[in-house]
Amino acid sequence: DYEKFKNELIRLLSFVTVFGVCFIVLMGVAGQWATRIAFGSEYEISTRNMLLLAISSIGLMYALSITQGLLAFHRQGLSATAWIFGIATFPVTISFGEDLFLRVEVALIFTVFITVLLLGVFITKSFKTQRVNKT
């Protein structure tokens, strides 16, 4: 039943949203401390860097969740298309700016944003197609 599947995917994305907000807040508050404890003070990075990495990580969770939905619809080609366009964004985006960390972090965010945007369009079309085919 595609309606049930759609509701489950929405529940998953809602969970990722709640988890993501909590994770971003946690990284903003304790990210520096956690890296200092885990890797030593020589590997400490700024709060800004932790927040940007957390944002890209949550974006990746969205992308992987929606990809699973497309795979369930047997839409591997659409999934691959979204990932290829997203990955192609990385080298273009990383070429702007001076600060290497900031360039990589922003490029990661743009990469997952483009990927999630395309995956979202493709999964929405897939749900609409299934609804039309069902009737």
Question: What is each stretch, according to the model?
Answer:
Residues 1, 42, 74-78:
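Conserved short cytoplasmic inter-helical helices of the MFS fold
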Residues 1-39:
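Specific pore-lining/lateral-gate transmembrane helices of multi-pass inner-membrane transport
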Residues 1-4, 126-135:
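Interhelical loop/hinge segments that connect adjacent transmembrane helices in multipass membrane
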Residues 23-29, 33, 48-94, 101-125:
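Short runs within selected transmembrane alpha-helices of multi-pass transporters and secretion channels
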Residues 38-42, 72, 97:
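Helix-boundary and loop/linker segments of multi-pass membrane transporters
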Residues 39-40, 101, 128:
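Residue-level recognition of short, structured coil/turn motifs
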Residues 41-49:
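Juxtamembrane helix-entry segments on the extracytoplasmic side of multipass membrane proteins
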